[in-house]
Amino acid sequence: MKTKCVRHSDAQGMVEYALILLLIAIASLLILQLSGISVRDVYCRVASGFGANACGGTAYCKDDFSNLNGWKVSAGPATGWKIVNGQMCADSYGTLANKCSMAGMPSNDYVAEIDGAKLNQGNGYGLFFRATDSGLGMNGYAFQYDPGLSGVVIRKWVNGAEINPALAFKSMPGTDWYGAAHKLSVKVQGNTFIGMLDGVPVLTATDSTYPSGGTALRTWDSTQVCMDSFGVNPIAP
């Protein structure tokens, strides 16, 4: 009589391999969540790399800078902002409010962004968010690309004045701040704000002073900067 031998080693190896893959997947998800990146964000970036528009949605506000009709100078010289070759360019200090977002949006939570921003001179530029114009200046917050501080920073503003200390600051020594185009964006959700540079989270701040508000562009000192486009989008689920 022949005896049959059942081999368990191959099956056990497959189970162990599957468990390892599961642990790697769980760890990756936790890292993404801690970094403020959703799985959908990753999928959208990969799909976009292959030319797909799988994550298209309706922007709350957007501007390709074909003209200045959607903007209002809130501070600084009226001639400080110009459309040059399809880009929004600033050659001075000032604040330029986005009329669409200031008029109100479907949600107080959003992602505001400027794309293709190239700083040629000066101490930096930034994005106001959850902002309103008090008549004395902006109330709200600003996320700033700030070579003057050699870093990026999120500040609270009251009646046109920035409040110290900053809500969040990240030093970036050794960064070449000039001549390269960047995407500056901020994810605004509840009382938590995540500042991103080229799609990568770089700092997080929390504050509950301003629960709602629109967006604006900001420059200071002798800044010269041009940017390709602007948008305020819903947060991906």
Map each language-model feature to its residues.
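Short, solvent-exposed beta-strand-to-loop segments that form ligand-recognition rims
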Residues: L197-A216
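Short tryptophan-centered beta-strand motifs in secreted/extracellular beta-sheet-rich domains
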Residues: F65, A112-I114, Y178-Q189, F193-G195
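Short carbohydrate-recognition loop motifs
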Residues: T79-N98, G213, R218
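Short, aromatic/His-centered strand-loop micro-motif at the edge of beta-sheets
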Residues: G160-K183
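Extracellular carbohydrate-recognition regions
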Residues: A54-G76, D228
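N-terminal leader/signal peptides at the extreme start of proteins
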Residues: M1-D10
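Secretory/extracellular carbohydrate-interaction modules
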Residues: S92-A161, A236
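N-terminal single-pass transmembrane signal-anchor helix
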Residues: D10-Q33
